[in-house]
């Protein structure tokens, strides 16, 4: 019985992975969507630059 449970779980994981990889094709609403940010770390780097340029009360963390 334990092997059957593991087999069912593995099959479910493989099926869900296949759905995530293939997706649901190009839907009409997707074409009008706002483009995603290709550089998500940009805002974080800007904040760190401001912290580094300003007087920082936490010297060990500000670099």
UniProtKB/Swiss-Prot annotation:
Disulfide bonds join 56-62. Ca(2+) binds at residues 53, 55. It comes from the Eukaryota. Pfam families: Conotoxin. Residues 24-51 form a propeptide. Its main location: secreted. PROSITE patterns: CONTRYPHAN. Residues 23-41 have a biased composition (Basic and acidic residues). Residues 23-48 are annotated as: Disordered. Inhibits high (L-type) voltage-activated calcium channels (Cav) in a calcium-dependent manner. This is Glacontryphan-M. It comes from Conus marmoreus.
